[in-house]
A protein has these predicted regions:
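Conserved phosphate- and dinucleotide-binding cores of soluble alpha/beta proteins
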Residues: 1-121
Length: 121
């Protein structure tokens, strides 16, 4: 599975308010919050926030974690907090859905210098 981490720590469209590490579904409809929608503009996917859909379909966290391998690519300084939180917080829970990858034995995280800028290396 190839995925990324959002500015608020989301994976797929599993944002902190709606992520569920025990979701019984594989795919679910989600409402995109303002942070997630603005990121779509920041990433160049849409010209304005008004162009960004308010809802999407997303693989759930358990569906993502069921993959044998996770290849997570995280470029951009705007994602530095999410990378730091994913790797260093004591909590592995829905406050930062990307923390779920820490329990996955086949996850690899690829960062650029900008997204890794908050890490103490």
């Amino acid at each position: 599975m190839v995925l990324g981490i959002g500015e608020n720590g989301h994976i797929a469209f599993n944002d902190p308010p709606v992520a569920d590490f025990n979701d019984p579904l594989l795919i679910k409809p989600v409402e995109l919050d303002a942070v997630c929608r603005q990121q779509q503009v920041n990433d160049g996917c849409f010209a304005t926030i008004d162009d960004v859909p308010t809802h999407a379909l997303s693989l759930t966290v358990p569906a993502l974690m069921s993959a044998a391998k996770l290849f997570c690519s995280v470029p951009a300084k705007t994602k530095a907090w999410a990378v730091k939180e994913t790797l260093t917080t004591d909590r592995i829970d829905e406050h930062c859905p990307a923390t779920a990858m820490r329990k996955h034995g086949g996850a690899t995280l690829y960062c650029d210098a900008d997204s890794a800028s908050m890490l103490e290396l």
